[in-house]
Amino acid sequence: VLWDGEWYIRGITAAGRRIGTAADREGRVHMESNAWAVLSGVADPERGKKALASIKEHLFTPYGLMLNAPPYTQPDDSIGFVTRVYPGLKENGAIFSHPNPWAWAAACVLGEGGLAMEFYDALCPYNQNDKIEIRQAEPYSYCQFVVGKAHTAFGRARHPFMTGTAGWAYFAATQYMLG
């Protein structure tokens, strides 16, 4: 029910409609459901690797992983709030920093250390220092989110320090990436 052939769906509405399927025009791929399918043990290695490949193909940017793509452009009350957020901001197609480390850890669970490092390096504030004119935030702070591809300010970081990213990054790095 949750596997869609290349990735795990986001969820199911109260009316039974699947969210995050290949057939969806908006909100087709979601990062969190795929990372947690691996971390929870629901995904077998074959599906887990396909899910991570889909994350990389559809959600990876030079600034980190977007939460979903393509972003929602039409409000849909059956899905909820995310469909009312401007495309490319916050929960709707932005690089929301807090859950990015879940994908790093998931890659490590599957033995994909190189992929975990690629994801890590993209979000790491220090590694974005040469893009400061775009990022416009401190090079030592994770930010709540980085504006996603669908927005004209793609790559601009927002709300420094207002995030749980540092704790999750530390956990993913020390408990998964370093062994």
Label each PLM-derived region with a short phrase.
Residues 1-179:
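Acidic, mature catalytic/reactive cores of soluble proteins
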